[in-house]
Amino acid sequence: MVTEESLRNIDIHELLPQQEPFVMVGKLTAFDEKRTMTETVIKEDNIFVFDGVFSAPGLVENIAQTCAARIGYVNKYILKKGIQLGFIGAIRNLEIVGCPKVGDVITTCVTVIDDVLGMTLANGVVTCNGETLATTEIKIAVKEAE
């Protein structure tokens, strides 16, 4: 059984193709067949922070990287293979209600709607202090390893 504590102990960099300074997720906090969650502290040196606020493009990238963390976890711990590159194929019904400030902790939940032929369709929700900041439907295309 996968516990939150065991997930939090995973170095997120092991799951993502992105590297600093473009890592937009902090810790993996939940994983099951359909749902993946991450937790991220907004830091002042983040490239999407302007005037102390984490911008809307950063929220979208955070959702995409939560999807990437899910794919990375499956590849590393279940399928025992390497990290795959993924690309945002589509963003639909994006709604940004607010943006977090430096020091805030955001929680991102991605729920898989469909996962077939290297394409993942998911709903993403970003919250902070119990308030929803962003919601979207996202499609991620995964490049097969060569």
Regions found by a protein language model. Name each.
Residues 20-55:
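Catalytic strand-loop segment that frames the active site of acyl-thioester-processing enzymes
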Residues 18-24, 102-106:
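Short coil-to-beta-strand transition motifs
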Residues 5, 71-107:
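Hydrophobic beta-strand-centered segment that forms part of the acyl-chain substrate-binding groove
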Residues 26-29, 92, 97, 111-113, ...:
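Conserved positions in beta-strands of structured domains
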Residues 2, 37, 69, 101-104, ...:
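HotDog/MaoC-like acyl-thioester-processing domains
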Residues 9-19:
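Short aromatic-glycine motifs in intrinsically disordered, low-complexity regions
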Residues 55-80:
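Active-site helix/loop of acyl-thioester processing domains in fatty-acid/polyketide metabolism
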